[in-house]
Swiss-Prot record:
Pathway: Steroid metabolism; cholesterol degradation. Belongs to the 3-oxoacid CoA-transferase subunit A family. The keyword Oxidoreductase does not apply. It is an enzyme of class 4 (lyase). The keyword Lipid metabolism applies. This is Cholesterol ring-cleaving hydrolase IpdA subunit. One of its GO terms (molecular function) is CoA-transferase activity.
Length: 296
């Protein structure tokens, strides 16, 4: 019998599989269960010129702060709590430093579904009653249904292009060494779709456990990734910080506000980078622990 592959790797090994110019999908939702440890590893790398597909939050903001992003496809970008709009994404967008493809949230899902099904596009009504088509120009087109309705009219729909990903980065709560992974809490977001739409798939988890423990700990419906959907598993405790991570921990609101405040001046941001983003993931976690103690 062939044994199942052990897919455990380090953060830097995962990012080492990425290349400049790639299109990457980042799972989670706003400031919720983002693969922040993988994002921080990406910040430490030489990878740049990225196209990012995301329901965005500080993941996209941090990558913009380091000049890593050339283009972004997103349904929204939010910190979910005050000040709500990510400061670094806002700066990059208003300064024209990145090309943006803003769209209805359902259009992102539709584009990922098309990519997962290896289809060039899928039809959708979302976007028809907005300026999305004008913003996208020739990149977004319509299609006429070949099936007339009861009145004999053929409906015009958005032909949402597949959001094909070179790589997907997601964070879940529990996983095994083979790539099976599950979330805890109330929402799967669309992490499974990101992985299904990507050529390379990397999941960070709060804990790597034995398969037997994994299937006993969570309901079957929470087990959204199976080993065929994952190429690398990274054990990263607190790896979604400062975003929330289901039942593992809530959003670090004080640190998120510190992040946003630090973006207001070059001096403050330089200090933030020196303190939190210039070392290893262990260095980051130690600095975050010190910050929490000082704020207590």
């Amino acid at each position: 019998m062939v044994s199942k592959r052990d897919k455990r790797i380090s953060l830097d090994d995962a990012v080492g599989e990425l290349r400049s110019g790639m299109t990457i999908g980042i799972g989670g939702w706003g400031s919720r269960r983002k693969p922040m440890a993988l994002v921080r590893a990406l910040l430490r790398s030489d990878v740049t010129d990225l196209t990012v597909v995301t329901y965005g939050g500080p993941d996209l903001g941090l990558l913009c702060s380091a000049g890593k992003v050339t283009k972004a496809y997103y349904g929204f970008v939010s910190l979910d709590s005050a000040p709500f709009y990510d400061p670094w994404f806002a700066k990059a967008r208003t300064a024209g430093e990145i090309a943006v493809r803003e769209m209805d949230e359902g259009m992102v899902k539709c584009g990922l579904e098309a990519a997962a099904a290896r289809l060039p596009f899928l039809p959708i009504r979302a976007g028809l009653g907005s300026d999305v088509r004008r913003f996208w120009g020739d990149e977004l087109r319509t299609v006429t249904s070949p099936y007339p309705d009861a009145s004999g009219k053929s409906e015009t729909l958005i032909a949402m292009p597949a959001l094909n990903l070179d790589a997907a980065l997601v964070h879940l709560n529990l996983g095994d060494k083979h790539g099976n992974a599950a979330y805890t809490g109330v929402d799967p977001y669309f992490d499974d779709l990101y992985c299904a739409a990507a050529e390379k798939r990397f999941v960070s988890v709060e804990r790597v456990v034995e398969t037997e423990e994994l299937v006993k700990t969570v309901p079957l419906q929470n087990l959204i990734l199976n080993r065929m959907m994952v190429d690398g598993v990274v054990e990263a405790p607190n790896g979604a910080h400062f975003t929330l991570a289901g039942d593992s921990y809530g959003r670090d609101e004080k640190f998120q506000r510190h992040y946003a405040e630090s973006a207001k001046t070059p001096q403050a941001w330089q200090q933030f980078v020196a303190t939190y983003l210039s070392g290893s993931e262990d260095d980051y976690q130690a600095a975050v622990k010190k910050f929490a103690e000082e704020q207590a």
